[in-house]
UniProtKB/Swiss-Prot annotation:
Protein name: Nicotinate phosphoribosyltransferase
Family stated for the protein in its record: Belongs to the NAPRTase family.
Pathway note: Cofactor biosynthesis; NAD(+) biosynthesis; nicotinate D-ribonucleotide from nicotinate: step 1/1
Organism in which the protein naturally occurs: Pseudomonas putida (strain GB-1)
EC number: 6.3.4.21
Length: 401
């Protein structure tokens, strides 16, 4: 019989997280070690998660004893932009559960983080992975790894049947599926199969532990929280995106050069993404809105600045599958470089399983609200409607209501 899809422990070491958490954490250590933040959990589809509270708490408490393994340190030391002082800090880092509140509120599971950004930043990914896997264990206790593996091979067959050899040689796909994975075992199996048998180009994973374990490239630069936090880190609101990008440039000196565009909107982002940033950053990441229309804006912006789009890369990561990735690839092929980060559709696509729609987002920085407006109304997030209205006014973003 095939192996179970579940291990006894859900998060088994400190690096079972997304790579951009480490890159942002280093930026926080060097630039904002005293910043305080708040985060709030949301289940977008209203699923009742109250029955899972006890096991969620149990798995959460087990984060206490996670540390950086000695065997993992040489792997991180080979990544040139992770500095020795940050790795020393990471070696000493421990999750502190006094920054976490979890319980029932208004007949729903609630989860809040409040504390120093430097000590809270690593909670997001393992907490979401815990909630997802605890729920999946309860609903699908007899799931076997073979069911996830077979589904993945069916996708490979589809891709071979619908893409030419030339397209397969150029189509780049990465695993971005940690936070809403079916289980840790399923993600590891999926990434292993992608590494060994993917018919196109498998370029890496966002999961640092799997990158270390399977000898593949860890991928990621920045998340929304990096830009959102800068709304309350000192500069005028109108200058917050510029401050976030400038701080990133100073931290990484041209490395990790994929910028996220939809914290406010693509139009607002491009207003700040001048020739200086357009030359320094290697490309842009799409995470909301219609992807090809977004790409056309990016291409036009580069051309307006006198930059050849074929020297830049667009990374797509918004709810993708292989079918949609191939469509986008074909629409943009030969005009700009593209790459695709696929999450839930790789790590939680099993017949009979409905993946979760859960997020854990920053709501406050230094005691004041932060917001993500995005290029998709459903992804707008802020606890303070007045702040969202003010941000729309400052960046001249029309209401989507």
């Amino acid at each position: 019989m095939s192996e179970s899809a579940f291990a006894e422990r859900i998060v088994h070491n400190l690096l079972d997280t997304d790579f951009y958490k480490l890159t942002m954490m280093q930026g926080v250590l060097h630039n904002y070690p005293d910043a305080d933040v708040e985060w709030e959990f949301r289940c977008r589809n209203g699923e009742d998660l109250r029955p899972y509270l006890g096991e969620i708490r149990n798995q959460l408490e087990r984060l206490n004893d996670l540390t950086l393994d000695d065997g993992q340190l040489p792997f991180l030391e080979r990544i040139s932009f992770l500095k020795p002082d940050f790795l020393r800090f990471l070696r000493l880092f421990r999750f502190n559960l006094r920054y976490v509140r979890v319980g029932i509120e208004n007949d729903q599971l609630f989860l809040r983080l409040k504390g120093p950004w430097l000590h809270v930043i690593l909670f997001e990914v393992p907490l979401l992975a815990i909630i997802s896997e605890v729920r999946n264990r309860q609903l699908h206790p007899h799931m076997r790894l073979a069911e996830a593996r077979d589904q993945l091979y069916r996708k490979f067959d589809w891709l071979r049947a619908h893409a030419s050899d030339e397209e397969l040689a150029e189509l780049q796909v990465a695993d971005f599926g940690t936070r809403r994975r079916f289980s840790s075992r399923v993600q590891e199996e999926v990434v292993r199969v992608l590494r060994d048998d993917f018919p196109a180009r498998f370029v890496g994973t966002s999961n640092v532990d799997l990158a270390w374990k399977l000898d593949i490239k860890p991928l990621g630069t920045m998340a929304h929280e990096w830009i959102m936090a800068h709304q309350q880190l000192g500069p005028r609101l109108i200058d917050s995106q510029i401050a976030a990008l400038d701080c990133w440039v100073r931290e990484y000196r041209g490395l990790l050069g994929i910028a996220l565009t939809d914290c406010i909107t693509m139009d607002a982002f491009l207003g700040d993404f001048d020739l200086y940033f357009a030359k320094l950053f290697d490309g842009l990441r799409h995470d909301s809105g219609e992807p090809v229309a977004w790409a056309e804006k990016a291409i036009a912006h580069y051309q307006k600045l006198g930059i050849d789009p074929m020297t830049k890369t667009l990374v797509f990561s918004d709810g993708l599958n292989l079918t949609r990735s191939l469509e986008i690839f074909r629409a943009l092929r030969g005009r700009i470089n593209v790459s695709f980060g696929i999450g839930t559709n790789l790590t939680c696509d099993i017949p009979g399983v409905a993946p979760m729609s859960i997020v854990l987002k920053m709501t406050d920085c230094n005691g004041a609200p932060v917001a993500k407006i995005s290029d998709e109304a459903a992804k707008t997030q802020c606890r303070d409607e007045n702040f969202v209205a003010y941000m729309r006014h400052v960046f001249k973003v029309p209401s989507k209501e």
